[in-house]
Amino acid sequence: MLNKSLHYLTFFSLCLAFLFSSGLHGQQTKGVNYREYDIESLQALMQAGDLSSRQLVEFYLERIEAIDRNGPQLNSIIEINPQAIEIAAALDAERQKSGSRGPMHGIPVILKANIDTADEMETTAGSLALKGHHPPVDAFVVRKLREAGAVILGKANLSEWANFRSTHSSSGWSSIGGQTKNPYDLARNPCGSSSGSAVAVAASLTSVAVGTETNGSVVCPSSVNGIVGIKPTLGLVSRSGIIPIAHSQDTAGPMGRTVKDAAILFAAMIGEDPADPLADIFPDSLPDFVGSLSKDALKGARIGVYRGHSGAGVDARVDRIVEDTIATLTSLGAEIVDPIEIDTEGMGKAQHEVLFYEFKTDLNAYLEKSGAAINSLAGLIEFNETHSDTVMPIFGQEDFLEAQTKGPLTDEKYLNALANAKRISQSGINNALKNNKLDALIAPTRGPAWLTDHINGDHSSGISSSSLAAISGYASITVPAGHVVGLPIGISFIGGEFSDARLIQLAYAFEQASKARKPPLID
């Protein structure tokens, strides 16, 4: 059954769509490779009648079959939407009859598998415990995308439970989806937890994708897979209908091959949702995230170099990319303030308590509301123990067990930890920006992708700059900046609350000058 956002298109309209997508126009695009095409280019072709959304969907489906299911078996897509071609055809008919809804009309999108859809696809967080789970309604962000005319192409594999099950997990592995591979080196890890979303974008299995982040889960996989990822200010993108970890940090975020593509998707995702507890801080007005992009955005900007991130100085090759980034920013007219030091002592410990407390409460609430067959964390723990051979063949559920010991969110220990985590992270960013009159901070997003290891779990270099933005709830964006032995390295632009538009502008200007992204050589 077609989604209501298609406005109950008539049978005649559907016939038009099929004629449009398989007739003369189909002959014009036969054999065309849409790998690496950006959204604006695709829209131009569709507006000219030289491409249909159905043809684009079919191109991606063929590519998924060729290199995700077969060949190198990237294993990034956990499920294909069986209605994708039908929806695309209906949107083609609508375009012919009444024009385009906007820049996302007919554009395929992959969703992380922890995002609810009320269709034939499951929402599982990659866990066999939720196999067969069909939520009753779309997540708010999915409703926004459907309204914008996006085609939900499928769901992406992820680190099971968004990497909140075990202390020894392998990022990109789930009991339903198996191990996702990095397209730049199949033996290396895609990071997580939005692993499949990042790989699908990097390998041109979709135009764009939606990931989710609690701490690093959008920006890390974006960095190591050579794409752009936006971690929004908390409250801009609704969390309703997304399997949670912690409401004080959780957000969905757009992922694309270019800053502009990510910005286009971002603009379509944003909206005030009364069901989200943060609805009261939603801005009265929003900037033009796409129209404000300029190659000159860095001219006169003051950029601080954050040197206190995790793993600072451990990899000289990453340090050289940071120095190259500084040189590019300077050449574009930015004023560099280096170094910027931020005292984060106690932040990580406080975050630890917050996440485990909130996970138990938030997950129990989600499971109960969404009608899942297993409706509590305690039930999940029992299921995993009973089915350990298939659910826990390579790592356990230490995080689940610790979370289950936590009390209610009225506990003084939780309240103190939450206050400390927010105070340290928010004041750290706020003071750095204010005292130095900065537009943004920069830091390497992550080190190069590590070898996937199912015996010892993840073991990266330790380089990471995601925590400040994640814990504070402030904005960040990662953009490709260079490579270490062919492996992508991203640079993060980090700002204050609701600095999203400014960060996107700065990242766009850097991207246009550096042109650092190189597609993976995989087919």
Placement of each model-derived feature along the sequence:
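Bacterial N-terminal signal peptides that target proteins for export
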Residues: 1-12
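Bacterial N-terminal signal peptides
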Residues: 10-20
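Gly/Ser-rich catalytic/binding loops embedded in alpha/beta enzyme cores
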Residues: 29-215, 233, 300, 433-435, ...
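Glycine-rich, small-residue loops and helix-cap segments
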Residues: 49, 106, 112, 147, ...
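Structural helix-boundary/capping segments
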Residues: 66, 151, 202-304, 309-312, ...
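Short helix-loop capping/hinge segments that flank enzyme active sites or metal/cofactor-binding pockets
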Residues: 105-125, 291-307, 357-424, 478-488
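Flexible glycine/proline-enriched surface loops and loop-helix/loop-strand junctions
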Residues: 125-127, 181-183, 193, 243-251, ...
